[in-house]
């Protein structure tokens, strides 16, 4: 199948005047050329992933590079056979990356233009992975790590990125005096997180420049030492990184078998991302727990128009019943 669609991943921390109006104008331009994607605009900068054919994406890159302060913006490009998005969204937010510092009564937010970790090339990052005296931290959400991660990287005991600062403070003694390098998908989260670590007093903090997306495309490292796939926030869900010796590290939520297929829990009030096969999705009604399986608004049940008798039958097959006590 021909790969005639390009997916552009990018970000830039740069002051944007009248960012709300900028977002509205940006959306109008994107729609005028038929671009699809999701873009966040804030006073501190821009962060987006978009897709379209070659002509459309080229028009977009030319347009962005014509904007004041964005002449050198770095686009990371994937070639795909299908669109990565169905619609076009451009939204104004307070921040393009929310680290949650103010939410947790920490210090003020980080400005990466003033404070950030040292940039590491893919080659330098690979060397750091092989250095036993270097601590490698994954700064992404838990479900991103579970699908794929760098070999030997620490998985913080957190659900999402915003919990990372508190986790680091709780585990400070483990790596305060060591070299620490961090990584994320495209680099935008690491700019802030590494800067926060510098401000916390860590003396030697590095970040993978361009993120995992760049590491996988580098002709020298070719994604080596990455295990599994990289989670992406578009229709693709998962993309390859390691082109040397790829492996599967994802495990099915229900039986632990190798799996790289993500779905959202059928309970809309849970919505946890879980790895599971189509067979187990059907078997467990796409519910990550008994409570979610029997929830009255379970989306899997409603989508498949299952009768109560059919739900009871499937629950019985896994040793559960409608009226049993919830186990979560």
Swiss-Prot record:
Catalytic activity: uridine(34) in tRNA + AH2 + O2 = 5-hydroxyuridine(34) in tRNA + A + H2O
Gene3D superfamilies reported for this sequence: 3.30.70.100, Rhodanese-like domain
Record-linked InterPro entries: Rhodanese-like_dom (IPR001763), Rhodanese-like_dom_sf (IPR036873), Rhodanese_C (IPR022111), TrhO (IPR020936), TRHO_N (IPR040503)
GO molecular function (one): oxidoreductase activity, acting on paired donors, with incorporation or reduction of molecular oxygen
CDD domains in alphabetical order: RHOD_YceA (cd01518)
Top enzyme class: oxidoreductase
Keywords, in A-Z order: Oxidoreductase, tRNA processing
Active site positions, chain numbering: 184 (cysteine persulfide intermediate)
Any one GO BP annotation for this protein: tRNA modification
Pfam families reported for this sequence: Rhodanese (PF00581), Rhodanese_C (PF12368), UPF0176_N (PF17773)
Keyword hit for tRNA processing: yes
HAMAP family (alphabetical): TrhO
NCBIfam families tied to this protein: PRK00142.1-3, PRK00142.1-5
Protein family according to the UniProt entry: Belongs to the TrhO family.
Full protein name: tRNA uridine(34) hydroxylase
Taxonomic lineage: Bacteria, Bacillati, Bacillota, Bacilli, Lactobacillales
């Amino acid at each position: 199948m021909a790969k005639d669609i390009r997916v552009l991943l990018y970000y830039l921390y740069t002051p944007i005047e009248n960012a709300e109006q900028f977002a509205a104008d940006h959306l109008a331009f994107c729609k005028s050329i038929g671009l699809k994607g999701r873009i966040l605009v804030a006073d501190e900068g821009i962060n987006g992933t978009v897709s379209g054919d070659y002509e459309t994406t080229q028009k977009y890159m030319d347009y962005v590079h014509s904007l004041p302060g964005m002449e050198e913006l770095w686009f990371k490009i994937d070639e795909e056979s299908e669109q990565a998005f169905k619609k076009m969204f451009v939204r104004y937010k307070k921040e393009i990356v929310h680290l949650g510092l103010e939410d947790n009564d920490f210090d003020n937010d980080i400005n990466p233009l003033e404070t950030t970790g040292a940039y590491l090339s893919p080659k330098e990052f690979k060397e750091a992975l092989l250095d036993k005296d270097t601590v490698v931290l994954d700064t992404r959400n838990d479900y991103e790590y579970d699908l794929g991660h760098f070999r030997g990287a620490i998985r913080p005991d957190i659900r999402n990125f915003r919990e990372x600062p508190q986790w680091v403070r709780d585990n400070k003694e483990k790596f305060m005096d060591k070299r620490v390098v961090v990584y994320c998908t495209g680099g935008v989260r690491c700019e802030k997180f590494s800067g926060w670590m510098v401000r916390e007093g860590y003396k030697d903090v590095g970040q993978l420049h361009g993120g995992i997306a760049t590491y996988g495309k580098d002709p020298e490292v070719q994604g080596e030492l990455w295990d599994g796939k990289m989670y992406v926030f578009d229709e693709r869900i998962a993309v390859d990184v390691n082109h040397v010796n790829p492996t599967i590290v994802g495990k099915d939520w229900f039986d632990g078998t190798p799996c790289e297929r993500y779905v959202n829990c059928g309970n809309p009030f849970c919505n946890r991302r879980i790895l599971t096969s189509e067979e187990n999705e059907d078997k467990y009604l796409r519910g990550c727990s008994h409570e979610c399986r029997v929830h009255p608004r379970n989306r899997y049940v409603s989508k498949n128009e299952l009768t109560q008798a059919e739900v009871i039958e499937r629950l019985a097959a896994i040793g559960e019943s409608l009226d049993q006590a919830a186990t979560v």
